[in-house]
């Protein structure tokens, strides 16, 4: 398999996707006692896709952007699943859209406990970003706003599957410890997203010790 790299950095000055472990964050920054969106953390490959209002399409992995004529899981998912949905969005709203999510299935990160590696390749959306046409104003799709990925899929018609939604919950230390101490059968863990953009993960130690 030949991987033809187009950029060593993301287009539009994007940074790579990442969530810090809650244990590494000072307690006063965890926003304990506040409500947040909780989603299941899927064990796959992070991917970013961009379709500009002018029709330029970009397929990005965690660190690289790939040319559209190469063949790998990022471009396969991009062209077969993501691009058709983004083309409908751009046609309807005439705006550039950036989506981020997790590629799962088809042996991605295959190990003895990863249920997400089974089945066909899928794209599981967890972030939408909406830059202006001149790329000077960015709407980051914060939770609770009309740019958020749930609003885009449930209300505005973005035809992409999302990561599993566990719901809006009040975050406490016991809540975080519950997921940290969860058995491996429950999966990798959860991602917690607050309305101000704060986000972090709580991962199952049992899951990681059995990979």
Language model: regions and residue ranges:
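Core nucleotide-handling region used for phosphoryl-transfer chemistry
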Residues: 1-211
């Amino acid at each position: 398999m030949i991987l033809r790299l187009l950029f060593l950095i993301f287009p539009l000055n994007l940074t790579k996707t990442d969530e810090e472990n809650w244990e590494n964050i000072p307690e006063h920054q965890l926003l304990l006692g506040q409500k947040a969106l909780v989603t299941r953390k899927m064990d796959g490959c992070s991917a970013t896709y961009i379709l500009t209002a002018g029709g330029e399409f970009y397929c990005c992995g965690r660190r690289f952007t790939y040319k559209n004529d190469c063949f790998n899981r990022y471009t396969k998912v991009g062209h077969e699943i993501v691009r058709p949905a983004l083309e409908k969005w751009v046609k309807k709203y005439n705006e550039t859209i950036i989506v981020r999510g997790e590629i799962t299935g088809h042996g991605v990160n295959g190990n003895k406990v990863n249920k997400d590696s089974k089945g066909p390749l899928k794209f599981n959306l967890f972030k939408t970003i909406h830059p202006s046409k001149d790329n000077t104003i960015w709407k980051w799709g914060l939770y609770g706003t009309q740019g958020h990925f749930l609003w885009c899929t449930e209300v505005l018609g973005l035809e992409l599957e999302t990561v599993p939604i566990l719901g809006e919950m009040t975050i406490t230390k016991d809540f975080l410890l519950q997921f940290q101490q969860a058995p491996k059968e429950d999966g990798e863990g959860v991602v917690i997203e607050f309305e101000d953009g704060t986000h972090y993960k709580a991962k199952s130690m049992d899951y990681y010790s059995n990979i």
